[in-house]
């Protein structure tokens, strides 16, 4: 009986997280919503506490699904992203804090401890791998075309703000919210792979398509692991935004080859 209950709890969480695939990859909202309802309903039957937390995740996913995630650098597009993505973080946070009276979702910016050699080393590895691999992916696969063409200074500035703002939001939602809620009920690696499904699905609609998941899956899993290890939002944000800085430079270079022409692995731009 205990094994059946554990399996049902895992299935409930898997249904909620798997809903991100039809919601953001296949853009089939009804299927995604059905999976969310099924996952939360199953959790209600087997573990009410889990159901409360899965409902928070489901609520955030529904909020995100109300808009297209395709990059849009217009005033209206950036405002829409800011409002909707902020709501997707604030809704679960406020409900768990003031309705559930819990303190599961937290944003631990500083740990009070200096970075370890591991942390400096990991950041260095991320920068080197990003510099070498990301040009091959974005330019070689043509995925850079999933972002608007930027040639003017104002457009480039908007792209910089947008890429970094979404990168910060990724950590607030996928790590500090989804991963933290799942971690209350499942072992670290189980919770981590479940949040990675949501993380990677979101990134797919955002533009990381073609063979992008070969990069985004390990990145999402590693970010969860690093947060679990360091307990530092500041550190995982630093890693993420360092990665995003390279992405920004590649996107600008792909549209305007004379700019940021520093990538030795960049294929010829088609």
Region spans (language model):
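Alpha-helical transmembrane segments
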Residues: 5-22, 56-63, 123-132, 192-195
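Alpha-helical transmembrane segments and their cytosolic membrane-interface
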Residues: 1-33, 158-163, 181-185
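Functionally important transmembrane alpha-helices
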Residues: 192-196, 200-204, 208-267
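Alpha-helical transmembrane segments in multi-pass membrane proteins
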Residues: 21-99
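Membrane-embedded alpha-helical segments of multi-pass membrane proteins
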Residues: 30-41, 82-90, 156-160, 169, ...
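Membrane-interface helix/loop boundary segments of multi-pass membrane proteins
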Residues: 111-117, 168-194, 228-232
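Juxtamembrane helix-loop-helix connectors linking adjacent transmembrane helices
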Residues: 72-85, 93-166, 257-268
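Membrane-helix interface segments
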Residues: 50-54, 152-155, 186-193, 209, ...
């Amino acid at each position: 009986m205990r094994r059946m209950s554990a399996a049902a709890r895992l299935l409930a969480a898997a249904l909620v997280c798997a809903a991100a695939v039809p919601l953001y990859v296949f853009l089939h909202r009804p299927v995604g919503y059905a999976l969310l309802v099924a996952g939360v309903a199953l959790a209600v039957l087997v573990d009410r506490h889990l159901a409360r937390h899965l409902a928070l995740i489901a609520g955030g996913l529904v909020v995100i699904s109300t808009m297209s995630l395709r990059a849009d650098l217009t005033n209206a597009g950036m405002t829409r992203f800011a409002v909707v993505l902020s709501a997707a973080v604030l809704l679960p946070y406020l409900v768990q804090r003031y309705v559930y009276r819990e303190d599961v979702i937290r944003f631990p910016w500083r740990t009070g401890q200096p970075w370890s050699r591991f942390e400096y080393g990991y950041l260095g590895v991320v920068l080197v791998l990003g510099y070498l691999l990301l040009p091959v992916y974005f330019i070689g696969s043509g995925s850079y075309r999933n972002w608007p063409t930027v040639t003017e200074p104002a457009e480039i500035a908007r792209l910089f703000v947008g890429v970094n703002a979404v990168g910060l939001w990724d950590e607030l939602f996928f790590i500090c919210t989804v991963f933290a809620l799942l971690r209350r009920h499942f072992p670290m690696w189980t919770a981590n792979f479940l949040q990675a499904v949501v993380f990677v699905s979101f990134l797919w609609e955002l533009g990381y398509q073609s063979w992008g998941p070969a990069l985004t899956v390990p990145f999402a899993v590693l970010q969860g692991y690093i947060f679990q290890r360091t307990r530092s939002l500041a550190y995982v944000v630093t890693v993420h935004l360092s990665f995003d800085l390279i992405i920004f430079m590649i996107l600008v270079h792909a549209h305007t080859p004379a700019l940021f022409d520093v990538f030795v692995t960049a294929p010829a731009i088609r």
